[in-house]
Amino acid sequence: MFNNTTTSFGSGPGIVVVPTPATTVPTTDFPGTTITSNSTFIIIGPPPPFPAPPRSIDLTPLKLIFVVIAFVAVPALVYALFFNGPCSSSRRNSSSSRTSSSSDDTPHATVDTPPITETTVTSESGGKFHKDTHSKEIGNECSVCLMVFTDSDELRQLSECKHAFHVLCIETWLKDHPNCPICRTDVSVKQQTEAPNVPVNVNGNVNRSGGNRRVSATSRDDDWRQGLPDASSLV
């Protein structure tokens, strides 16, 4: 039983005035404690909740991949635009200037080079290939058709560089290229016109058409070894 006496301390939210009990009442909140008739309790409500912590950034794996790609792609794009662009343009300008200068020089070379005619093509020294005699001096392969020389093959030797080829191969080559297929030595039209066609028979002798002089293949081989001009072209 409670009496009619009440006690209050201040006012405000969360403050509850409890009437003073008339008798001793045991409490269950605090074991071993009793409430007497002169006790007064003020019950304070729960404190206000703490503010919620800031939410962390929730990144899914797909969003994380996009973020990484953006961090890598943006610097690469900036580098390509501001650093690589001027270098590539300067390289293009230099290459175009070199191309224009080479194109300016090319017409002079084309004009100065005389056309290759049938007369100049067939005016080199030629003859039949003999393996035992010519394999060491002129080789065993035609550099135009890449075929191996065989005995009795009709060969033609350039007087400037002493390289030998099949007659048909070198004639076809010289119609389009004014140089040797191996060493790129320019074939002089004047020297070709002056050098007569020298047939070589199987026995190794060189016969001059229009003359009685015979030059042996042995002396010709000696000229090759010593670096002297071909003996057949001295007449």
From Swiss-Prot:
Polar residues bias: start-end ranges: 116-125
Keywords from the UniProt entry: Membrane, Metal-binding, Transferase, Transmembrane, Transmembrane helix, Ubl conjugation pathway, Zinc, Zinc-finger
Gene3D superfamilies to which the protein is assigned, alphabetical: Zinc/RING finger domain, C3HC4 (zinc finger) (3.30.40.10)
Segments traversing the membrane: 64-84
Entry EC no(s): 2.3.2.27
Amino acid composition bias (Low complexity), ranges on this chain: 88-103, 201-216
Notes on the domains: The RING-type zinc finger domain mediates binding to an E2 ubiquitin-conjugating enzyme.
Name of the protein: RING-H2 finger protein ATL33
Species in which this protein is naturally found: Arabidopsis thaliana
Gene: ATL33
